UniProtKB/Swiss-Prot annotation:
NCBIfam families: L3_bact. Part of the 50S ribosomal subunit. Forms a cluster with proteins L14 and L19. PANTHER family: 50S RIBOSOMAL PROTEIN L3, LARGE RIBOSOMAL SUBUNIT PROTEIN UL3C. Residues 126-150 are annotated as: Disordered. One of its GO terms (cellular component) is cytosolic large ribosomal subunit. This is Large ribosomal subunit protein uL3. One of its GO terms (biological process) is translation. Belongs to the universal ribosomal protein uL3 family. It comes from Exiguobacterium sibiricum (strain DSM 17290 / CCUG 55495 / CIP 109462 / JCM 13490 / 255-15). It holds the Pfam family Ribosomal_L3. InterPro entries: Ribosomal_uL3, Ribosomal_uL3_bac/org-type, Ribosomal_uL3_CS, Transl_B-barrel_sf. One of the primary rRNA binding proteins, it binds directly near the 3'-end of the 23S rRNA, where it nucleates assembly of the 50S subunit. PROSITE patterns: RIBOSOMAL_L3 (PS00474). Keywords: Ribonucleoprotein, Ribosomal protein, RNA-binding, rRNA-binding.
C-alpha cells in the first residue's frame, strides 16, 4: 500500500552505519501531520487521504480554513496535500507520525528546487560553450534559433530564463533512520529545496 507524509527539510548531516561507513543524510521533520479529509470512491471517484501540516498564525486564518480544519478537530494548516492510497486504515483527525515509514524503506521525495534567478543556456540547460579564443564571436550564447523559413522561434527552444523554483521529485531514496520521539526521518542523500522548505515523502513508485 502506498504511504505518504508531509515534512520540513531541516538540512543535511552524516551518520555512521553498522559497518562504520559514513552515510550522508537529509533530516526531515514530520511532526504534526493530521488527516483532514478522506476522499472515497462513492463521493469523489477516487481514494486519497488529505494531510495537513504546519499551523497557520491565528491572525492569518480565514473562515473556510477554520471550518475545514474543525471537522478534524485540528487547527488550520499551511501545507495540505493528498496522498493517493486506500482510506480503510485512516480516520479524520488522526495524527500521522514518523513511524509510518521504517528504516530501509525506499521513498520518493518531492520538493521545490532552490531558485537560481535568471540564468543563461549553459547553466540552465547544461549546454556547451563556444571557443573562448579572440577570433570567436560565439562564447556563451544559446546558438542557432532554428531555420529561416518558419520566420519564428519554435516553442520549447532551450533559451536563457528563470532557473529553479520548480517542483522536483528525487526517486528511490533510502530511509536510513526513523526517530519517532522527535518526529524525524533521516533520508539517504540530498533532496530538493532549501532548508525549512516543505517536502512530500511517499512510497517509492519504482522501489521496494
Amino acid at each position: 500500500m502506498a504511504k505518504g507524509i508531509l515534512g520540513t527539510k531541516l538540512g543535511m548531516t552524516q551518520i555512521f552505519n553498522e559497518s562504520g561507513e559514513v552515510v550522508p543524510v537529509t533530516v526531515v521533520s514530520v511532526e504534526g501531520n493530521v488527516v483532514l479529509q478522506l476522499k472515497t470512491m462513492e463521493v469523489d471517484g477516487y481514494e486519497a487521504v488529505q494531510l495537513g501540516f504546519g499551523d497557520i498564525k491565528e491572525g492569518r486564518q480565514n473562515k473556510p480554513q477554520k471550518g475545514h480544519a474543525a471537522k478534524a478537530s485540528a487547527t488550520p494548516k499551511r501545507f495540505i496535500k493528498e496522498i493517493r492510497t486506500s482510506v480503510t486504515d485512516f480516520e479524520i483527525g488522526q495524527e500521522i507520525k514518523a513511524d509510518t515509514f521504517a528504516a530501509g524503506e525506499m521513498v520518493d521525495v518531492t520538493g521545490t528546487s532552490k531558485g537560481k534567478g535568471f540564468a543563461g543556456a549553459i547553466k540552465r540547460h547544461n549546454q556547451s560553450r563556444g571557443p573562448m579564443a579572440h577570433g570567436s564571436r560565439y562564447h556563451r550564447r544559446p546558438g542557432s534559433m532554428g531555420p529561416v523559413a518558419p520566420n519564428r522561434v519554435f516553442k520549447g527552444k532551450l533559451l536563457p530564463g528563470r532557473m529553479g523554483g520548480e517542483q522536483v521529485t528525487v526517486q528511490n531514496l533510502e530511509i536510513v533512520k526513523v526517530d519517532v520521539e522527535r518526529g524525524l526521518l533521516l533520508v539517504k542523500g540530498a533532496i530538493p529545496g532549501a532548508r525549512k522548505s516543505q517536502v512530500v515523502v511517499k512510497t517509492a513508485v519504482k522501489g521496494n
